[in-house]
Regions:
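Active-site-proximal alpha-helix that buttresses catalytic centers in soluble enzyme cores
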Residues: 3-69, 111
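Short beta-strand scaffold positions
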Residues: 49-50, 115, 136-137
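Glycine-rich phosphate-binding loop signature in dinucleotide/nucleotide-binding domains
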Residues: 41-43, 124-131
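Active-site signature of alpha/beta-hydrolase-fold catalytic machinery across serine-
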Residues: 61, 144-148
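Acidic, low-complexity terminal tails and accessory targeting/binding regions
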Residues: 2, 38, 68-72, 78-90, ...
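Generic beta-sheet signal
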Residues: 5, 131-140
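Phosphate-handling substructures
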Residues: 23, 64-118
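Short active-site segment of divalent metal-dependent hydrolases/proteases
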Residues: 13, 141-142
């Protein structure tokens, strides 16, 4: 039985130091509407999201469309890069991708964040077998999850994601069978 997980990278957000409560920007809100229109054609059964406001806001339109609440799953929250703000984000993110077990003080390594994401994926695939599930999440974690199944989903792939972006991962039981990008600007 096939289970489809639609990973939705959140749309553009307005920067605030409040990582959890950072909202979508005006552009992000418009792009979220586009992503929701795309998902309306996918026979979605459930919506699950990271607890971060920008991820929830990106998928709440499809939840409204199907008449379901957005369920929160902490396993899909963004990876913690560092406890304190980093001085050079590009340097910091490059380092964790070059050395998967490396972490900045108070942060998660790629290995740790990936394990957290995969645990959440396995839970959903086991609980919602044969269903179509939207997952509102974050680019870095989404690519780490995809990388677990196929190494071609790497740092360069992450750098080229759109915001938002949508990837449909099709599972047969716990085996990933297919990955398709379904995001497109309308």
């Amino acid at each position: 039985m096939l289970t489809n997980l639609y990973f939705v990278r959140h749309a553009h957000s307005t920067y605030t130091p409040d990582e959890l409560g950072r909202p979508l920007s005006l552009k992000g809100s418009r792009d979220a509407e586009v992503s929701n229109r795309i998902l309306e054609n996918e026979n979605i059964d459930f919506i699950i999201s990271s607890p971060y406001k920008r991820a929830i806001q990106t998928v709440e339109g499809i939840a409204t469309f199907i008449g379901k609440e957005v369920a929160i799953e902490d396993g899909f929250k963004e990876r913690t890069l560092s406890l304190e703000p980093v001085k050079d984000f590009n340097l910091a993110i490059t380092k964790v991708w070059e050395e998967p077990s490396f972490s900045w003080p108070g942060g998660e390594s790629n290995t740790v964040a990936q394990k957290r994401g995969i645990k959440a994926v396995e839970k959903i695939v086991n609980t919602h077998e044969g269903k179509n599930i939207v997952i509102g999440t974050h680019g870095n974690l989404m690519v780490l999850i995809m990388n677990y199944f196929d190494q071609k989903y790497d740092f360069e792939f992450w750098k080229n994601l759109d915001m938002p972006d949508i990837y449909k991962l099709t599972f047969e039981y716990k085996d990933l069978k297919e990955v398709n990008r379904i995001w497109k600007r309308i």
